A protein has these predicted regions:
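Conserved N-terminal phosphate-binding loop of PLP-dependent enzymes in the Aspartate aminotransferase
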Residues: 1-411
Length: 411
């Protein structure tokens, strides 16, 4: 396995021996540092996907990697059958960092969403006193919360749910960015336990709701004794120009779901945070994870969050996001190919006019790669641009020129 293989050979290995559940951009990456990645041939690229916002702190951030290596040499895993020297420190740190009583540590974003759903239902029966097996959770159209069986049960994406039934009941789907729809459901459904929402719909193409939407929904939840559950796996940890996207409307979710950049991309770490009233419904043996809260994850997460704070990444994302969207708006004013831009902070999307060819956004991304910038389409005609938050203004402006030059080739 030490023989040097070409990109074509490595891609063929994946195609032959791996499940075909992804359609990657045809580049084989071998190294990363900051905003850059290199392929196996040594070509250097700007990374404008950031592993779906998992590497907000930049690839292989030296402080994070130093913590990872030091802890890996000392103790990697204990399970939760025993205490470990890192978990309590992390739990104190992360709850104070985000302003909650308790945290339940998990590994992946989907695991954290599943955990939040379980917490919500259990709270509904044990605290709110809903009749057994009646609890409903309201979700939004075009949501993306993961790909587990329960989560795809309330997806409207056929790729996510086709031939995976029967599906888990107990979910009510309403339009996103429509507080009146939530109000109607809360008035008509007496057994609603929670409202699960993305503050910005990332996989839907950085779809930003109207100003005031989150606060209206939060207030409705308060009035009906319903838990407001925010999935900030992709939008959280400084990506949108605030520590949390909910912070734009001063909304403090009853249950907060985090993942991805919680480790800076160094290892899988996710978390569910809430108050004592909600979190204390979980008792020994009722939920768990062998790897959740492991010593490496705990140590790495503390350092990853310290980096976000110390390097003021939220402020940087806010400032540079304004520059990026303004330049993309100028591009769209004269382009036949690019329609409009939307986003917050450094989570942005360029909408491509796909009238002539369904594959135009994909072809643009391939050409962007040739020009030294990696991005990937979502939903056929949307290109998401989300670089690591450590990008400098000079680097961002260089990338803007790459995007403009590439789009011009398709005019």
């Amino acid at each position: 396995m030490d023989a040097k293989l070409s990109a074509a050979q490595l891609m063929e290995l994946e195609n032959k021996h791996g499940a075909h559940n992804y359609h990657p951009v045809p580049v084989v990456l071998d190294k990363g540092e900051g905003v850059f990645v290199w392929d196996v041939e040594g070509k250097k690229y700007y990374d404008f996907l950031s592993a779906y916002s998992a590497v907000n702190q930049g690839h292989c951030h030296p402080r994070i990697i130093d913590t990872l290596v030091k802890q890996a040499r000392k103790l990697t895993l204990t399970s939760r059958a025993f205490y470990n020297s890192q978990l309590g420190r992390y739990e104190e740190f992360v709850t104070r960092y985000f302003g909650y009583d308790k945290v339940l540590p998990m590994n992946t974003g989907a695991e954290a969403v599943e955990t939040a759903l379980k917490l919500c239902r259990k709270w509904a029966y044990e605290v709110k006193k809903l009749p057994k097996d009646t609890a409903e959770i309201v979700v939004c159209r075009n949501n993306f919360h993961g790909r587990t069986t329960t989560i795809v049960s309330f997806s409207i994406d056929p790729d996510a749910y086709n031939n995976y039934g029967p599906f888990t009941p107990g979910f009510v789907v309403i339009p996103y960015n429509d507080a009146e729809a939530l109000a109607k459901v809360l008035d008509e459904h007496p057994h609603v336990a929670g409202f699960l929402v993305e503050p910005i719909q990332g996989e839907a193409g950085a779809y930003v709701p109207d100003e005031g939407y989150l606060k209206k929904c939060y207030d409705l939840c308060r009035a009906h004794n319903v838990l407001f559950i925010a999935d900030e796996v992709q939008t959280g940890i400084a990506r949108t120009g605030k520590l949390l996207a909910c912070d734009y409307e001063n909304v403090h979710p009853d249950i907060l779901i985090l993942g991805k950049a919680l480790s800076g991309g160094a290892c899988p770490v996710s978390a569910v945070l809430s108050c004592n009233e909600v979190m204390d419904v979980i008792r020994p043996g009722q939920h768990g994870s062998t790897f959740g809260g492991n010593p490496i994850a705990a140590a790495v997460a503390v350092t990853a969050l310290e980096v976000v704070r110390d390097e003021q990444l939220a402020d940087r994302a806010y400032r540079l996001g304004l520059i990026f969207r303004e330049e993309m708006r100028k591009l769209c004013e004269t382009s036949r190919v690019a329609s409009f831009v939307r986003g917050k902070g450094l989570l942005n999307a360029l909408i491509i006019n796909n009238d002539e060819t369904k594959d135009l956004a994909w072809e643009i991304c391939l050409k962007l790669g040739e020009n030294g910038l990696l991005a990937k389409p979502t939903h056929t005609n949307i290109i998401r641009f989300a670089p690591p938050l450590v990008i400098t203004e000079e680097q961002l402006k260089e990338c803007i020129e790459i995007i403009k030059k590439t789009i011009a080739l398709f005019e």
